[in-house]
Amino acid sequence: MISITEKVHGTSGISAYVLCKHPRSFANKAIAWISEKLLGLEIEGTTQYYHDYDYLYSSRSVIKNQYYNKNAGPGFYGCDVWKFADDVVRPWLQKGMTAYYEIVGFLPNGGYIQKGYDYGCIPPKEGDVYQHGVHFKVLVYRITMTNVDGNVHEFSAREVQQWCDFVNLTPVHQYYYGYAMDLYPELSLAEHWNENFLQKLANESLFYMEQDSPTCNNKVPHEGVVIKVENMKSEAFKLKCFKFLDKEGKALDKGESNIEDAN
């Protein structure tokens, strides 16, 4: 089974409600030491720290909570768009849950998250309250659940769609869910099926390949699709449109920066 979803051009964000390492206060250290050393009681963690559930949020590679990462700054554009996205997702997280998503549209300062890619959003004007669904959108594409032993359960693509529907969040748009061979039944499994499948998928008009973005008001190239294999693992593959790659290459040649490169 596979899932094929829209690949959107934004910035990655992660929100989690997971076990975190907390330093003990001086009084708590003393209590823990007495409990363990003098009374022979088993304590959670060590005399120096303990574990408890807490909320974390991050970009693709940088934890943004300043009490966990003292070096965390406002990021590439001088504003913490990840905190606004976390405010949208955080209320729905259960203990052990981590949500992965793309943030698209505009920044609080009115600039694009990714130049030209509005995804139906409008830029906030001076004095406007930065609003989800108006100025920016959060599109969830992956969810995991981690138990107290550190074992991770990967939500299926269908479960991601169902969970988002249940809590009124927005998942990435799903184009197809089913068996790969059923998408193009005319292809022979015995004759270079993998190559032929990818060639047809790369030009699939139903998925807007090599067309303009179907979800942006601006005329910009559709980025492509993400193919996720339903095998209880985090196994997904990106198939980008050549028109998008050409546009991205020209931007790099001009020296234009990218929010993803800095976060």
Walk through the language-model features, giving the residues of each:
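Core nucleotide-handling region used for phosphoryl-transfer chemistry
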Residues: M1-N263
